[in-house]
């Protein structure tokens, strides 16, 4: 847990920490954000999912006021001019960058000072953060001597040191090994429990499935789905895998018409009436049930159905490249 960070009092704005309506942003002939509506509830963990090039980074930068939309409007912590709220926001950009000669604790304090935190207090908090996360040995090390993952952790701490009400993270898990990814997930949950709103982008679906209360699936600059992960999964029917000793008989008429048969097993969507009526007919028809499993769809399955197989393959490829790096 980050030291000296009390739970936040209720914010003086509406129920949404971030809102965007009808947002459009083009670069020449390329429309990176194409008519997006988004609302991030206060205190929530909200994930923007999509492959590289989907428009995630441009959307975050537009919401933060780093770039202005060509059309539409946005509010950040209740203010229609987002940059005025910069001191209450922690932002980790996709492009990482720290001064290589600066010591780790100084880099964190410096980023806090840019957000209005007194330098002496920033140094105190920086040392406490590093020590509290088992990185006390890195306090006085220059950035150039740190591993890539440790340097990224330092930049993340610089995003958090001034106790922002809103944290925006662009691909925060990129470049981290599995252990540091788990630590980052724990840190995100910790901040959310303190009342901080977390908005992050990712092309790794598993992180969103574990962390997010709400998600937006983005492809081609548009939001293809917005809601809870459960709502995304509920768009798909559960799948049944059945194996029988008998290969034929009157009982087969009870199987759904779209059943796929393969080597004595049957694969079909869970019937609307549930599995019990079908089981009765199979038992009475002496099908000889050897095994039966019901597979609930995951968020990856929902992503494929919503954004398309090409977008899912691009997401998977990017994740595999990171794992191999």
Regions found by a protein language model. Give the residues of each.
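Short, charged/small-residue-rich alpha-helical element at the C-terminal edge
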Residues: 238-310
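ABC transporter nucleotide-binding domains
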Residues: 15-20, 25-219, 225
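A generic structural signal for short beta-strands and their flanking turns/coil linkers
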Residues: 87, 236-238
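ABC-family P-loop ATPase nucleotide-binding domain
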Residues: 1-24, 309-325
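Short loop/turn segments at beta->alpha junctions
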Residues: 103, 118, 228, 271-274, ...
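Short acidic-hydrophobic catalytic motif
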Residues: 230-234
């Amino acid at each position: 847990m980050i030291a000296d960070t009390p739970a936040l009092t209720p914010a003086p704005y509406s129920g949404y920490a971030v809102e965007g309506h009808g947002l459009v942003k083009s670069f020449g002939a390329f429309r990176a954000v194409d008519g997006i509506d988004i609302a991030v509830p206060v205190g929530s963990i909200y994930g923007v999912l999509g492959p590289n090039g989907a428009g995630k980074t441009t959307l975050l930068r537009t919401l933060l006021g780093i770039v202005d939309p060509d059309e539409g409007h946005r509010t950040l912590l209740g203010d229609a001019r987002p940059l005025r709220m910069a001191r209450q926001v922690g932002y980790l950009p996709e492009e990482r960058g720290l001064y290589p000669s600066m010591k780790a604790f100084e880099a964190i304090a410096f980023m806090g000072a840019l957000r209005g935190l007194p330098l002496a207090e920033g140094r105190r908090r920086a040392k406490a953060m590093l020590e509290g996360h088992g990185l006390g040995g890195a306090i006085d090390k220059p950035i150039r001597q740190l591993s890539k993952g440790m340097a990224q952790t330092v930049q993340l701490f610089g995003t958090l040191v001034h106790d922002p009400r809103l944290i925006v993270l662009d691909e925060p898990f990129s470049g981290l090994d599995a252990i540091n990814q788990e630590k980052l997930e724990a840190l995100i949950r910790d901040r959310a429990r303190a009342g901080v709103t977390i908005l992050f982008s990712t092309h790794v679906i598993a992180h969103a499935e574990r962390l997010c209360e709400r998600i937006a699936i983005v492809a081609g600059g548009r939001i293809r789905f917005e809601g809870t992960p459960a709502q995304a999964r509920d768009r798909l029917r559960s799948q049944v895998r059945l194996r029988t000793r008998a290969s034929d008989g009157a009982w087969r008429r009870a199987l759904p018409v779209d059943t796929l048969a393969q080597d004595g097993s049957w694969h079909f969507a869970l019937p609307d009436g549930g599995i019990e009526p079908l089981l009765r007919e199979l038992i009475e028809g002496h099908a000889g049930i050897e095994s039966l499993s019901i597979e609930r769809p995951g968020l990856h399955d929902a992503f494929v159905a919503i954004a398309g197989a090409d977008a899912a393959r691009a997401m998977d490829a990017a994740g595999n490249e990171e794992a191999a790096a």
